[in-house]
Amino acid sequence: MFRAAAAGPYDEAINKATDENLTSEDWGAIMEVCDRVATDANGAKEAVNSMIKRLAHRNANVQLYTLEVANALSQNCGKNMHRELSSRAFTDALLKLANDRNTHTQVKAKILERMKEWSDMFKSDSDLGIMYDAYYRLKQSNPTLQPPSAPQKNVLTDADRQKEEEELQMALQLSLQEEERKKRPAGASGATASSSSGGAAAGPSNAGGAVASGEGTNSTAGQAEATPQPVPSSTTAATVSRVRALYDFVPSEPGELEFKKGDVIAVLKSVYKDWWSGSLKGKTGIFPLNYVEKLADPTPEELQREAQMEAEVFAEIKNVEKLLTLLSAGNTGPREEDNEEISKLYHQTLAIRPKLIKLIEKYSQKKDDFTQLNEKFIKARRDYEALLESSMSHPPGPTYHQYAMRPPMTNSYGSGGYGAPPPQQQQEPPRFYNPAPAQDAPQYPATSPSPNPNHFIRPAGTPAPYYMGGAEGPGQLQHQQQPPYPQQQPQPAYGAPSRPQDQQRNPSGPSPMAPAPLNTTSSPPPGNQYTPYQAPGASGANNRTNSYSSTNGGAPQELSTSAYDSPIAQHSTNPLSNPSYNAPSAPSYSQGRPGAPTDDPYGPTSPGAGSSNNVGSAPPPPSGPAPSGPAPSAPSAPSAPSAPGAPNSYTQGAYHSQNPYAAAAAAAAAAASRTHVPGVYDGAGSEVSSTAPQPPAALQPGGGAQPQYKAYVPPGAPSAPGSGQEGPSAPGQNDGLADYYRSAY
């Protein structure tokens, strides 16, 4: 009478994707169905007809897999599939299955969930409104299928926090009491043990509202599974450690915890009044209390019963192994007695199957918990190692001590001028030859210092070069090793009183920058300042100084002069023509130069004793009358330097001053015989030739320029060779006289 429905083209593929023996969704088979439907014009209608047949199956797993296939087709097969899913035939099949009382609760909840998703997906198309109507009718007829709405996130008040703290203290107190009861002797009476058990069971009842007793444990647990009760709002997180999810929860805001029905969540703390913070599968977030139920901590009786059940299951392991051996080792035909034993062992194994499933679930959950704990531990260890490595790779830098900065060293005298005391400052220890210490004597102040920035000042603590006995002194050797630089010496103004030879300045005194004291016999009149003469191209040689040896202990003495003396010969001048502003009886500080006419402003005022360059004291001037002969109209030239080892240069100078013509001939011969002075260097480090007269440089220790005197140049006289312009000249220069005049001090 009844014909079986004709098999559709998609029945086999959909039956494979919704097989009742599957343990999970077969996504390979599901995607194969989606590919076939997407390429077939009539595939959407045929696939929906095949799914309606599978929804009529009585197995809940087949129904759940069919709903999953329908959801995959709706997301991958376009609008044609949307139209078939919103058809009257498919929606009626869904409503019929959901309203059947024999349908599993999970299947009903899944139907409601999928219909809601499809309603939201099809709401933009008015032709697909049948799905929304079917969803609205199902929600009205089955209000319990829909999960409750999440409560509002009300902030905890001070009273709520105080209550939570009180419950926490109560729970801690009960826990301590339980520990004390466990530590009591084992020989306690049974009444005491029973009362302790009753108190332990009553503790959670007072704290969290969970009712549990030693006799009705199984019945209470069974009722809890049948009708789960949400966590009451009066319960706090202080007394609850675990909760089980009653519904699926999808987060709607960041920070919320997603979970499925049946998940066990570890409670951490209270965040809002009806929201707690928990941890699940390595994730932390907040969840609503009306979606979960409280899990009471197991009592000692429950723990003992669970351990007994595990022992019974493990005792049956040998029967399971024996059954497997009989089933796998029988190569020949089964005997009758073996069949009886196999049947007996099989029934014994079936008896422990429910207990075995519970143990599998328990240890599977423990395995997941330990896996999550291991992951957290590994992450924490990696973070610690990373922090440790970063701290070791960037050690703190060494601490450096701050040293006091050396005060700046000045290279010139202060503004006090000649004779001003040097500034008291810390100086670097000298690294050169130090002559004999200077004599202590009062210093003579300068008459009128005037700064001149065009000249350099010799740094403090550096000895001036000098010559001693025809050999270079340490100062000159030092200048050969280091780069040469101009040095200057103080020069007194014109007409300054002279000082004796035995009180000349010593550069090795305690204050090397201080000038030597002067012994004066009369107060000097205000002297006139004159601009020093400088010839171009001779700036390097103008800054050279010379020093002489004195008879005071044989120590080398520094004597400033504007002329370059030969290291092997000493100049000598006529003491009679040596000019000085002082009286003839006063000792002269400056070197003498030949006399000049009285109308010459640079000429001498009175004959004075000239200072000599010879080793020893200067001889007294001749007391005889002046030599006869015509008076020269120009200053006579100084005598040429004598050859090395000259016995007495003073007598030669005196003889030439008395015989002008003999002096000119001797000077010409001496100039022709010498070409340069060895050991004498200019500012650039090259030797200075003595054939060209070098004008003196203005030397100023205190910043003021001291007067220099230009030699008289007769009209029409040629300039000095190499100077570039007219320089100092003297009678007889055309005859070969190459010396120059020393400036008077």
Swiss-Prot record:
Its main location: membrane. It is found in: Endosome membrane. Residues 186-214, 425-446, 577-590, 636-647, 662-672, 719-733 have a biased composition (Low complexity). Residues 238-297 form the SH3 domain. GO terms for biological process: protein transport to vacuole involved in ubiquitin-dependent protein catabolic process via the multivesicular body sorting pathway. The keyword Protein transport applies. Residues 163-182 form the UIM domain. Keywords: Endosome, Membrane, Protein transport, SH3 domain, Transport. Residues 142-237, 390-745 are annotated as: Disordered. Residues 17-146 form the VHS domain. GO terms for cellular component: endosome membrane; ESCRT-0 complex. It is a peripheral membrane protein. Residues 518-532, 540-576, 648-660 have a biased composition (Polar residues). The keyword Protein transport applies. Belongs to the STAM family. Component of the ESCRT-0 complex which is the sorting receptor for ubiquitinated cargo proteins at the multivesicular body (MVB). Component of the ESCRT-0 complex composed of hse1 and vps27. This is Class E vacuolar protein-sorting machinery protein hse1. It comes from Neurospora crassa (strain ATCC 24698 / 74-OR23-1A / CBS 708.71 / DSM 1257 / FGSC 987).
